[in-house]
Amino acid sequence: MAEISAKMVQELREKTGAGMMDCKKALTEAGGDLVKAEEVLRKKGLSAAAKKTGRAATEGAVASYIHMGGKIGVLVEVNCETDFVARTEGFQGLVKEIAMQIAAASPRWVRREEVPADVVAKELEIAKAQAREQKKPEAILEKIATGKVEKFYSEFCLMEQAWVKDDKKKIQDVLTDAVAKIGENIQIRRFARFVLGEGLEKKQENLAEEVAKAAGLQK
């Protein structure tokens, strides 16, 4: 068992706002891993961030981010509790980081609860079919499929994606850190990601025909 030092307890307390004993218990349960201990506190509703999530967040900002010379654009709405916080540098910086994440990582939904049931069912079906193709035992197909769906969530649900600036953190962790630091409930409400030409068929013309047209040989 990992030794839990006073410094570790203090660090977790400063990060989460939870009590000293709760922090020590969480660290013990997590084997000394600070990130896992933070998750333990959140699940038990003991962290400051967890306590703030029930508060209404109706202020905030809608921000845009344009990447790669105008080829990718993002609009995102992030909510907080007060207009004062919405105008702060810390909150505005957070919104920009989230917009950049969306541009870089191409999520489809904010959280897993938004994924349509038919999409989840299809992913399960595909995962099972792949497992059968690999001659996996029928008894473990469900477990394999569930694992594949979890991976699907981590790839396409924004809150579960690895942060592009630090892949040891998920976006949920980034948000939790911001809540603890800023002191208000913060929620990512919705986003839209645009890619130039996405869904359009580019017209492919024959090179010889293009030359002929340029030379005035074809009408």
UniProtKB/Swiss-Prot annotation:
One of its GO terms (cellular component) is cytoplasm. Its main location: cytoplasm. Pfam families: EF_TS (PF00889). Belongs to the EF-Ts family. NCBIfam families: tsf. Residues 82-85 are annotated as: Involved in Mg(2+) ion dislocation from EF-Tu. Associates with the EF-Tu.GDP complex and induces the exchange of GDP to GTP. It remains bound to the aminoacyl-tRNA.EF-Tu.GTP complex up to the GTP hydrolysis stage on the ribosome. Keywords: Cytoplasm, Elongation factor, Protein biosynthesis. The lineage of its organism: Bacteria, Pseudomonadati, Myxococcota, Myxococcia, Myxococcales. HAMAP family: EF_Ts. It is found in: Cytoplasm. This is Elongation factor Ts. It comes from Anaeromyxobacter dehalogenans (strain 2CP-C). Transmembrane segments: none annotated. It comes from the Bacteria. The gene is tsf. The keyword Transmembrane helix does not apply. GO terms for molecular function: translation elongation factor activity.
